[in-house]
Amino acid sequence: MEEMMNEEIVTGVCNLYFDSLNANDLEGVTKALHFPHFRIMASGMVHTWNSAEDLWTWFTNRTSDDGWHHSTFDSIQPKKLTETKFHVNVTFGRYKEDNSLIGKYYSLYVITYDEEKWAMRAASVTG
């Protein structure tokens, strides 16, 4: 039962992150992520952000050229590793305001319980 509750919480973290990005809600992004936050890009480059503001600046600069408006999950698959750590395989699409597809992507989110909350500590991404 506890594992199911934790899976729901972890899925909720993923949804909070996307809902916050889609709503341009920096406070929500702050709640969904641990900082420092780490991102391993498809190229192998590693980004580290010490605040939601830093990540937000990077994200908006990265997505402004392709007309990004919102993202939606195609799948969220959490896998419990320890009592305080999940890996979450996600697939998602990025869309323009007219709902035309920019691209489909796969990511591995590392969600941990730390600092009295469940939040995303890191991600390995394809887009």
What are the roles of these predicted feature ranges?
Residues 73-79, 92-94, 106-112:
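Hydrophobic/aromatic beta-strand elements that line small-molecule binding cavities or substrate pockets
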Residues 1-31, 35, 41, 53:
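Short, low-complexity N-terminal intrinsically disordered segments enriched in polar/charged residues
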Residues 33-34, 92-94, 124-125:
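Short beta-strand segments enriched in hydrophobic/aromatic residues
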Residues 104-127:
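Short beta-strand edge/turn micro-motifs at domain boundaries
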Residues 70, 82-92:
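A short hydrophobic beta-strand element
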Residues 57-60, 89-93:
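Short Pro/Gly-enriched beta-strand edge/turn motifs at strand-loop
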Residues 27-76:
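A solvent-exposed, acidic/Ser-Thr-rich amphipathic alpha-helical stretch
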